[in-house]
Amino acid sequence: MKKIRSVTLFIATLLLTFNVLGQVSKSNDLYERQKAFVDLKFGMFIHFNIPTYYNQDWPDPEASPMQFNPTKMDCTQWAKAAKSANMTYGCLTTKHHSGFCVWDTKSTNYNVMQSPFKRDVVKEFVTAFRKEGLKVMLYYSILDTHHKLRPNQIQPKHIAMVKQQLKELLTKYGPIEALIIDGWDAPWSRISYDDVPFEQVYKLVKSLQPNCILMDLNGAKYPSDGLYYTDIKTYEMGAGQRLSKETNQMPALACLPLQSSWFWKTDFPTTPVKDPVKLVNETLVPLNKANCNFILNVAPNREGLFDDNALAALKVIGDTYKKDNQPANFKATGAPIISKNLAKNQPANSSWSDDMNIMDFANDDDFHSSWQSNPEVKQPWYEIAFKTPQTFNTVVIFESKPNIRKYKLEYEDNNQWKTFFEGENTKRVKLHRASKMHGSKIRVTIQEADSSPSIAEFQVYNEVR
């Protein structure tokens, strides 16, 4: 009997070891991919779609495919222009928020093959950029006003369409360095990662192209010092999102248009673009030093070509910018959060709260509101009481600023409290990964803090990889 127990214990230990080693290996693989992405330094965003034929970035969702007809489109011109600026890659908008697809897709008739142009723009883009020795990335919007993939309208058919479209993009056009996703769990799009399940999409992308970096432009919502639902932190500079060049410790991407907006407008040929020398010296170079890849948008006109003023600016950028060979310098971040937040909008309890800053502010999916402990409480506590018992392995405590220094985390299982962490952690984002736990409640007891504690978000996940 003892021999059987010993063998069983040995096998269980071995399986656990293999599982942990597998997770470490995947995390290390991602770390190498993140460094390789940051080391690309500088690339070209290309917003080219139905909005090009309107003077608005958000056109009529029912705009006819007949509008799209870039009779002189030359992706080789784009690629050579990118190369002249010392860029290393290009990224094309395959589908923007109005839902028009610029590739030969079987998922919808709202695509380029139904236009007078009848050419696969994605195919010509990847071919031209690779021929010039440049890597290729693709942009894809979850928000889709034409197909009614928008708040309070999402049905299973929409999720199936997203998966079909991503499968086409990741199987028909060779290796894709990175996929930039937009219009998803942002304050303005209001499509959550529950509405269109992020974990399913993430795993689909990685199953089709394991080396493809997946980024979501979710910087308007999620904090800068945690990887939430993205392999790379993203910053839309035109929307006021700013990376701290002094303190950033995350692999990052920042984007900005060369012209006044993302898609081409009729005044672009005669309107000055951003100062190319300033772009290099005040934006590109400082961002690169802060572990941030910079992607500059250049909008083709209605003929499918870059305007002369844009071409001239890119040449000046290339003459000014000399890509350094300094490798990315950030520590491994670990895998990003990709699963559903089990604590969101669940019943919450706490010790005495301060004024109106009560318990539900810490699990309302809003990083700008907080539960605040009353200053009279010496060791305040906060807990999530799940409506039904949950299995989980990851807990995140987010503070608006670092304050809590020492605390204990425990969960209730069969009316017994079990501690899984007790100690110090002074970071603003306190991330805890552990073996699987199962319980009806999870609680943090705060033992030391610099001032009266507050928690902006208390999050619980079951991360399966």
Kindly give the residue locations of the regions a language model identified.
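Bacterial N-terminal signal peptides that target proteins for export
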Residues: 1-8
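Serine/proline-rich low-complexity intrinsically disordered segments, especially terminal tails, linkers
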Residues: 8, 352-355, 375, 442
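Cleavable N-terminal signal peptides
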Residues: 9-10, 20
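Mature catalytic domains of secreted/periplasmic carbohydrate-active enzymes
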Residues: 23-357, 396-399, 405, 411, ...
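Short clusters of hydrophobic/aromatic residues that line enzyme substrate/ligand-binding pockets
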Residues: 103, 254, 362, 371-372
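Aromatic, loop-rich ligand-recognition surfaces of beta-strand-rich domains
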Residues: 328-334, 363-465
